[in-house]
UniProtKB/Swiss-Prot annotation:
This is Demethylmenaquinone methyltransferase. The gene is menG. It holds the Pfam family Ubie_methyltran. It is an enzyme of class 2 (transferase). GO terms for biological process: menaquinone biosynthetic process; methylation. Its EC number is 2.1.1.163. It catalyses: a 2-demethylmenaquinol + S-adenosyl-L-methionine = a menaquinol + S-adenosyl-L-homocysteine + H(+). InterPro entries: MenG_heptapren, SAM-dependent_MTases_sf, UbiE/COQ5_MeTrFase, UbiE/COQ5_MeTrFase_CS. Methyltransferase required for the conversion of demethylmenaquinol (DMKH2) to menaquinol (MKH2). S-adenosyl-L-methionine binds at residues 58, 79, 106-107. GO terms for molecular function: demethylmenaquinone methyltransferase activity. Belongs to the class I-like SAM-binding methyltransferase superfamily. MenG/UbiE family. Keywords: Menaquinone biosynthesis, Methyltransferase, S-adenosyl-L-methionine, Transferase. It comes from Bacillus velezensis (strain DSM 23117 / BGSC 10A6 / LMG 26770 / FZB42).
Length: 233
């Protein structure tokens, strides 16, 4: 019986959780932190904000949201991998982030009421869900009117030559790094597949609009290897 995408992805993240943060830095050459910082600048999260970080993983973006919102903020992080959440819980406890609550759950069926959050984010997680549009619609449902839905994700470079080099890197070098640093060649081979199949910037912007979001904008990083998309409700 063939594994579903959801089962396969769950297995990947349950296995690579211990080395996930290190591998993010290796694979992106530390750029993922700069991309997130720039995205946070664009979002302009205010003191006391309520935010949800979907597919929060080890909670790096969740913590960034908490630092921006301050002690009066209310931040939720949700992920379907208990092992990834265990790393996040340790960070939250060590940092004393009392405004953060991490939850085990499914991005396809968010366990929150309509119009609950000022910001709903997803970082390097949308490409791994079974249905992109369903998750975007769920994110729109739980964000407040006037709130932002934000996705930071790998993208598809458009410049000839660089695009080909990018896909060669993802196909051959990234799995090699996975084997060398995390002993997880198979799992990182899957992650390059998910990145290759993920929509480009214009197509993802169209999906944001199809999900009912308005004034959709996107910002390209590092020649198009990643992008932030923001839409309003």
């Amino acid at each position: 019986m063939q594994e579903s995408k959801e089962q396969r992805v769950h297995g990947v993240f349950e296995k690579i959780y211990k080395n996930y943060d290190q591998m993010n830095s290796v694979i992106s050459f530390q750029q993922h932190k700069k991309w997130r910082d720039k995205t946070m600048q664009i979002m302009n999260v205010k003191e006391g904000a309520k935010a949800l970080d979907v597919c929060c993983g080890t909670a790096d973006w969740t913590i960034a949201l908490a630092e921006a919102a301050g002690k009066s903020g209310e931040i939720k992080g949700l992920d379907f991998s208990k092992n990834m959440l265990s790393i996040g819980e340790k960070k939250v406890k060590e940092g004393g982030y009392s405004q953060i609550e991490l939850l085990h759950g499914n991005a396809m069926e968010l366990p929150f009421a309509d119009d609950s959050f000022d910001f709903v984010t997803i970082g390097f997680g949308l490409r791994n869900v079974p249905d992109y549009l369903t998750v975007l619609k769920e994110m729109r449902r739980v964000v407040k009117p006037g709130g932002q839905v934000v996705c930071l994700e790998t993208s598809q470079p458009e410049m000839f030559g660089f695009r080909q080099a990018y896909f060669l890197y993802f196909k051959y070098i990234m799995p090699f790094f996975g084997k060398m640093f995390a002993k997880s060649y198979k799992e990182y081979s899957w992650l390059q597949e998910s990145a290759r199949e993920f929509p480009g910037m214009k197509e993802l912007a169209r999906l944001f609009e199809e999900a009912g979001l308005t004034n959709v904008k996107y910002h390209s990083f590092t020649g198009g290897v990643a992008a932030t998309h923001i839409g309003w409700k």
